[in-house]
């Protein structure tokens, strides 16, 4: 039968061996994290409804989608009469008076109001 001392020394030896394995740097994981941090997306997201259009209609569709989603993830609001952006602090826990803070006019496509898509071509 093993003595208490030998069991303890075996446990300590096994524990030390296990700790040495844990302390090794996970090289592959570090390489993948660095590669992911410096990588670029393969393609840019494109609205599905724009995929069948070509030329200026395609450019207009993309610009319209960018215009429609301009303030979606930020606190920026596009003021249409001045074509400027303003930052409004929005407390998301409060209710807003929608009749005073939103434009109720009908939306128009950028291509319908003469938005230029000339990129020097």
From Swiss-Prot:
**Which domain of life does this protein belong to?**
Viruses
Q: What is the lineage of its organism?
A: Viruses, Riboviria, Orthornavirae, Pisuviricota, Pisoniviricetes
Query: What is this protein identified as?
Result: Non-structural protein 3a
Q: Which residues form the signal peptide?
A: 1-39
Q: Which species is this UniProt entry from?
A: Bat coronavirus HKU5
Keywords for this protein? Signal
In its keyword annotation, does this UniProt entry include Signal?
A: yes
């Amino acid at each position: 039968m093993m003595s208490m001392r030998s069991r303890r020394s075996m446990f300590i030896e096994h524990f030390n061996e296990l700790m040495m394995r844990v302390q090794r740097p996970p090289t592959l994981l570090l390489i993948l994290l660095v590669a992911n941090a410096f990588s670029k997306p393969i393609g840019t997201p494109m609205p599905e409804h724009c995929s069948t259009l070509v030329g200026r209609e395609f450019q207009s569709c993309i610009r319209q989608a960018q215009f429609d989603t301009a303030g979606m993830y930020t606190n920026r609001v596009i003021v249409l009469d001045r074509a400027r952006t303003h930052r409004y602090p929005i407390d998301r826990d409060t209710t807003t008076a929608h009749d005073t803070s939103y434009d109720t006019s009908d939306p128009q496509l950028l291509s319908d109001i003469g938005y230029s898509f000339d990129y020097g071509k």
